[in-house]
Amino acid sequence: HGLSLSVPEGKVTSIIGPNGCGKSTTLKALARIWPCYKGNVTFNGEDIKKFSHREFAQKLAILTQAPQSPADLTVKDLVEMGRFPHRNWFGRKSMEDDAHVEWALGQTNMLGMQHRLLNTLSGGERQRAWIAMALAQRPQVLLLDEPTTYLDICHQLEVMQLLEKLNRELQLTVVMAVS
C-alpha cells in the first residue's frame, strides 16, 4: 500500500478516486494531521517533521471536507483566523495582518460580505470564505479535500474558477481530492 506522489510547484494537482480509497488520508498526511508511520513526506526537499507547527502552517493550508465554525462568526472573523501562524507571541493583529485579510477577502470577492455571519451565506459563499481564510495564511500550497462536494453545479463552477484564478495569478500550488 505504498504511495509515491510528487506535486509540481505552481500547478493544480487533483487526486481522483472513489470514496474510501485514501484521498483524504493522503491530504491529511501531507498536512501533518495524520502521521506517516512508514516513509516520509517532504516539502521542498525537507522532511515535514523538521518544521515547527508555526513554520509549517505558514507554508501549507488545508481545508477539510466540511469545515465547522461557531454560528456567530463573521466572514472577516473567520478570515482573520488564517493569520494566526503569523502573529506574535501575544496574538495581537498587526497592520500587515489586516492587509492580508483585506487582500484575501478581495481575491475571493468577499469584501462586501465580510460582516455577514457565516451561517447566513450560501454554500458557495461559505466555501469562498473558507478559501479566503486559507489565503490569508499566505501559504505556498493549498490542500482542498472535496472542495465542491456539497455544492450545486453553479457554486461548484464558481469555486473551481476561483481556484483556477488563484493558481494562474499567484502561482499557488493547489492539491485537491475529488471523487
Where are these regions (language model features)?
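Conserved ABC transporter NBD signature motif
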Residues: 39-47, 56
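Helix-to-loop junction immediately C-terminal to a conserved catalytic motif
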Residues: 31
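Conserved ABC ATPase "signature" region
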Residues: 80, 95-113
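Conserved ABC ATPase signature
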Residues: 117-121, 125
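Catalytic Walker B motif of ABC-type/P-loop ATPase nucleotide-binding domains
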Residues: 142-146
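The feature captures the beta-strand-to-loop junction immediately N-terminal to the Walker
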Residues: 16-18
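Conserved catalytic motifs of ABC-family nucleotide-binding domains
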Residues: 138
